[in-house]
Amino acid sequence: MTRTGQILFIQGGGAGAHDEWDDKLVESLRRELGGEYEVRYPRMPDEGDPCYARWSTAIRREMAALDDGAVVVGHSVGAAILLNALAGRPPEKGLGAIVLIAAPFVGEGGWLSDEFELTSDLGAKLPPGAQADVFHGLRDETAPPSHAACMPRPSRRRGCTSCPGGIIS
């Protein structure tokens, strides 16, 4: 089967997140897509202690290798860092979509960070043309659904989907 597109999946943070948590999401994605897409799943540096500078550098490096129209997916803290990295320096090639799963809002009303903050004007700084989808679990205590209301709104946000329970059951 010929692959028709690419998906870059950015993991969440925490010790073992790449191999013991997000790998389940990625394997499910690969299984459902049946090889139609190349799913890239890089290990982020020092996953047990996510650092915006290191992770955003790694994310930008991965995005530079993508084809035009690729889809980027971020989970948890990976989604927050991805969103801020996209707004700070959009990729040269166009994105097909931005998907945020259990993304915490970083800033007033959400998680606090000394490294970065998701500002209210961030949505206007995201790559033009890419549609954005946000998914939150209704019982997610780490990144609760209230964070979705605080998220910056990209110009082409398709919606925010609430899922019963957590994202991963």
Residue ranges with predicted function:
Residues 2-48:
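Short, surface-exposed "cap/lid" segments of acyl-processing enzymes
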Residues 73-83:
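Gly/Ala-rich beta-loop-alpha elbow adjacent to hydrolase catalytic centers
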